[in-house]
Amino acid sequence: MKKTVIELQNIKRNFQVGDETVHALRGISFSIQEGEFVTIMGTSGSGKSTLLNTLGCLDTPTSGEYLLDGVSVRTMSKPQRAVLRNRKIGFVFQNYNLLPKTTAVENVELPLMYNSAVSAAERRRRAIEALTAVGLADRLEHKSNQMSGGQMQRVAIARALINNPAVILADEATGNLDTRTSFEILVLFQKLHQEGRTI
């Protein structure tokens, strides 16, 4: 039986906008098992970003229960959520979120900078391994401005993999890419899924 990586139970998220209460999430319940590939779709304003922010421990629900890899998230403090997020979640964003004046290796190493148990040599080794896994072994020392959009997204995916996260969250990961490059990135996600990653 596969392990449950994400479990949401009756999640609600309300925002106060002036005198009005906006119900962004209304009683969302679902679970994601280890190794699943899940897509969340909906119209603009349907709560996708709010849900992704909740799943990514960037925001907390108004009510309900969220378990990430068996850990209850809703009552955690911001610093506790930051540690959990760094250890359990790999993020891939539409705009890559790479540091412009740093190399591919340095960008990928970033999540490990906050883990004192990992030496500088181990950080570099793991970053090179992750970049090789996404097909960028020949771009290790290239900076963002020396790479194409597809290459930058591959760096972002390598960075998401560096901590061996329980889940990879991708927010419109192909939104800024042309059709051919988008297809290549989706093929890469499919390859990661076939290797047992939860996406």
Regions found by a protein language model. Give the residues of each.
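ABC family nucleotide-binding domain
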Residues: 3-199
